[in-house]
């Protein structure tokens, strides 16, 4: 494990990385938010279905 070699690789990646523009950040935030809402809706539907099945039994 060569620490200086790993640190140089990390610094190289950080030098190449750039901050996203506002439009790019906004698009990523919208997509991530939609994904979170979709997963939450699926979980809520499963909760409702399982609650209905348990109440019938």
Curated annotation (Swiss-Prot):
One of its GO terms (molecular function) is protein transmembrane transporter activity. InterPro entries: Prot_translocase_SecE_dom_sf, Translocase_Sec61-g, Translocase_SecE/Sec61-g. Keywords: Cell membrane, Membrane, Protein transport, Translocation, Transmembrane, Transmembrane helix, Transport. The chain crosses the membrane at residues 34-54. GO terms for cellular component: plasma membrane. The keyword Translocase does not apply. This is Protein translocase subunit SecE. The gene is secE.
């Amino acid at each position: 494990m060569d620490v200086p070699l790993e640190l140089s690789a990390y610094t190289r990646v950080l030098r190449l990385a750039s901050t996203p523009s506002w439009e790019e950040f906004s698009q990523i935030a919208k997509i991530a938010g939609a994904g979170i809402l979709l997963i939450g809706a699926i979980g809520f539907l499963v909760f409702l279905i399982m609650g209905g099945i348990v109440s019938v039994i």
